[in-house]
Structure formats: structure tokens, C-alpha cells
Design a protein with these regions (language model features):
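Short beta-strand and strand-turn-strand segments in soluble, beta-rich domains
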Residues: 345-357
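Short glycine/proline/serine/threonine-rich loop/turn segments at secondary-structure transition edges
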Residues: 377-387
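Surface-facing alpha-helical segments and adjacent helix-coil boundary elements at the starts of domains
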Residues: 42-289, 313, 330-333
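Intrinsically disordered, low-complexity Pro/Gly/Ser/Thr-rich segments with frequent PxxP/GP/PP motifs
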Residues: 354-374
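Short acidic/polar inter-strand loop motif in beta-rich domains
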Residues: 378, 394-400
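Short beta-strand segments of immunoglobulin-like
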Residues: 307-312
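Beta-strand-rich binding/interaction modules
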Residues: 318-325, 329-344
């Protein structure tokens, strides 16, 4: 049975626990697609809240998986499985636990690859936790590359109970044309999660997923998938289309803008997709993206920006106040953002653009805007003491600035 290449295995074993928390929280829907013929759900509930995300795969979870698999496949060697997953458990990260679960299932479950997958398909409705089902896709990606069509169909099945967006990517790498043809067929699937997988799984730069370099270089092969899904009834699916297009803007912004210019942006759902797809370009002040949404003209305003308090500590709330006065005799459409220059550990700075609002400013009008946020550390951002510069950006142009000191 074929195993993944070393590079694929290395990717799967990366420590991404904090990031995967965001991934898991984004799926705010219960796994209610239960098999009416399945045994009653006996999986342990998710700890509330779990001490660490990796505790989603703890001894109790593994015992429940073993019990269910034994009822599905009586020859399943539960003791071997438990020994494999519990040995060295504490030292394993979340994704290492996911992968070890897949490896241990393969070693303890007799039969061919297809027989094992069919047993796991019976298990899927019984798990009752969307993130835990990710090990099912990991199993397919690890052992199924040589049984391409069967494995792709297995991923289509498993994604209904969680998501196979990471697991499908090795198949795209192995045979892009074949994989994308099958994924295009998924765009007509009655289940929104399968339709979403067609777009999300083929994103060139899926966050925390394996990068699809061929699609980074040339995004055209996924165009038929996005075209088929742009009018999807599900916001869950349409958001994926927008994120997919946003990925492409990072390498081919003119390509995306040309496609969007051909859309009927008077239709609200298409306008939403287009704007969400161009969010990075708009924050960067890209003229073509700004023009597409009516923000192409330089703002005629007098602007002031203030930060309060001017000195604060981590955990306190920062309030920004922008005072705008129109100097134009005509109404103006304005996209307003703010840019924080965060102090780095080295003493330098790195900027991040935040969305503020969009307004129609009447001729010669005055307006005051207020924005506040708590200054706290995240898994993706650590704050350092020092003077932070904040700029006000309107229609892509920096028009005012202020400072605050973080102690």
C-alpha cells in the first residue's frame, strides 16, 4: 500500500494547533448528518473548554474510536490500536495525534485499503465532532494515492462530517487535471460541504494547507469550479469562492479583476463575493480594485486622527477617533481603513491594515468616526513595548496619523 512522500508527511505533522482552532470554530454547524442505521452515538463530548486543543485526541477519544471500530469490524485489534496511540501521547502535537490515529487504524484494522475505508465510512457518522473526523481524511491521503478515484470519492463522503480540504490536496498534486475534473463534478452535489470542498480544497494558498504551486503559477484550471459556484445558494460555499479568488489576487490581481469586471455586480451576492475577494487589494490601495467598487477617486477631505489613551498597557482598550471634513462640492464614496505599525522584537516595525468602514460623505459634510480594539496578544501576533504609529487610509491613500505608546 502506497504511503505519502516524505514532504507530504512533513507537512501533515507540522504544529498548527492554534491555527486549527480558527479552522474548527469557523464551522459553526453540528454534525447532524447521522446514518439512521448507525449505532447510537457514544463518542465522548468535547471538553468544555479543552485544556489544550490536542486534547480533542485524548485517551477517552481513542477508546471511543476503538470501541466503535470493534463493533463495526470485530477483527479490529483494539489493544494494538490503543498501544500505538497512547505510546508517547503527551509529547505529540494536535496534528501529530491526528496522523498517529490514522496510522494506528491502518495497523490494527485488517483488510485491503478499500475495506478499511468502508469501515471508516461506517464510523464517520458516529464520531459526532467535526474536527476529530479529520483523521479519516488523513487516512485516505496517507494510504490512498494509488487508488485515486476510490479515494477521491471517499474524501467526498468524509467531508460531509467535517472537512477534507487538507486531505484532497495531495491528490491535486499527484494528478491535477484528474482531481479537478472530479471536483468540478462536486459543484453539483446536493450537500453544501461537498460543493464547498470543490472550491476550498483547490485554493492555491489555503491557509495552513499544502500550497498548490501549479495553481499559484496558473489559476485558470480552477476557473470552471468557481464559475459553477459563484451563484450557489449557500453563503458557506460563496465565502469559499471569495476566499479562493482572494488567494489568486496575491499572484494574479489583474486576472481576478478582469473576471470580476465581467460579473453583474448589481446582484448583491456577486458584489459581496467580489468585494470579499478583493479585500487584500483594497487594503493595499490597488487602483483597479478601488475603482471596481466606486472608490477610485482620491478623497477630497481634511482628516485628523487621534488615539486614546496615548499610553496604555497590554490588555487595555485603544480608541481611535477620525474627524473628516469634506472639501468637495459633491458627495464622495469612501473606503476607510486604518494602518497600525506594530513594534517588532528587533525594534523595527511591521504594518497591518484593518478595515474600518465604507461611507458616502455628502458635500462639505463633517463626520466623526470611532473605532476601538483591545490590545492583546494572539497566536499570530505578539506585541512589544514602544511607540506605535497609526495611519488613516482613505481610498488607498494615507491621509492622517497618530501615535500611542505601549508600555
Amino acid at each position: 500500500m502506497a504511503r505519502m512522500t516524505d514532504s507530504v508527511k512533513a507537512w501533515r505533522r507540522r504544529e498548527v494547533a492554534g491555527i486549527l482552532a480558527i479552522w474548527a470554530r469557523s464551522r459553526e454547524r453540528a454534525t447532524n448528518q447521522s446514518d439512521p442505521h448507525a449505532a447510537p452515538l457514544i463518542m465522548p463530548p468535547e471538553p468544555t473548554p479543552p485544556p489544550q486543543l490536542k486534547e480533542w485526541f485524548d485517551a477517552a477519544r481513542y477508546r471511543a474510536i476503538a470501541k466503535e471500530l470493534t463493533s463495526i469490524a470485530p477483527k479490529f485489534r483494539a489493544d494494538d490500536f490503543m498501544g500505538a496511540v497512547l505510546d508517547g501521547l503527551e509529547a505529540r502535537s494536535l496534528m501529530q495525534r491526528v496522523h498517529q490515529c490514522a496510522v494506528a487504524v491502518d495497523a490494527a484494522l485488517p483488510g485491503t485499503y478499500q475495506q478499511k475505508v468502508r469501515a471508516l465510512q461506517k464510523l464517520a457518522p458516529r464520531i459526532g465532532h467535526e474536527f476529530v473526523t479529520i483523521f479519516l481524511g488523513d487516512f485516505v491521503a496517507t494510504y490512498g494515492l494509488d487508488d485515486f478515484d476510490f479515494s477521491m470519492e471517499a474524501l467526498r463522503f468524509f467531508t460531509v462530517f467535517g472537512s477534507a480540504e487538507f486531505a484532497v490536496r495531495p491528490f491535486i498534486l499527484a494528478d491535477q487535471k484528474r482531481a479537478l475534473q472530479m471536483m468540478h463534478a462536486w459543484t453539483a452535489d446536493p450537500d453544501e460541504k461537498v460543493r464547498r470542498l470543490a472550491s476550498e480544497g483547490s485554493r492555491p494558498r489555503l491557509p495552513w494547507g499544502m500550497r498548490l504551486q501549479a495553481l499559484v503559477r496558473d489559476p485558470e484550471p480552477t476557473a470552471m469550479i468557481l464559475e459553477a459556484l459563484k451563484d450557489d445558494e449557500s453563503l458557506f460555499v460563496r465565502r469559499s469562492v471569495a476566499n479562493h479568488l482572494n488567494d489568486i489576487t496575491k499572484d494574479h490581481h489583474d486576472y481576478v479583476l478582469q473576471r470580476l469586471e465581467a460579473w453583474d455586480l448589481e446582484r448583491e451576492h456577486l458584489k459581496w463575493i467580489a468585494k470579499h475577494a478583493c479585500r487584500t487589494l483594497i487594503k493595499r490601495g490597488h487602483p483597479g480594485a478601488l475603482k471596481l467598487f466606486g472608490f477610485g477617486k482620491k478623497a477630497e477631505v481634511a482628516a485628523k486622527l487621534a488615539a486614546s489613551p496615548s499610553r496604555l498597557e497590554l490588555g487595555q482598550r485603544l480608541t481611535l477617533t477620525a474627524a473628516l471634513t469634506s472639501t468637495s462640492s459633491r458627495a464622495q464614496r469612501l473606503a476607510i481603513d486604518y494602518v497600525v505599525h506594530y513594534v517588532k522584537a528587533s525594534g523595527g516595525s511591521a504594518e497591518k491594515v484593518f478595515k474600518w468602514t465604507e461611507i458616502d460623505l455628502p458635500a462639505h459634510a463633517e463626520i466623526e468616526l470611532v473605532k476601538s480594539q483591545v490590545v492583546r496578544d494572539f497566536t499570530t501576533r505578539k506585541h512589544y513595548a514602544g511607540r506605535h504609529r497609526v495611519e488613516l487610509q482613505i481610498n488607498g491613500q494615507r491621509v492622517a496619523e497618530t501615535m500611542f505608546d505601549l508600555r
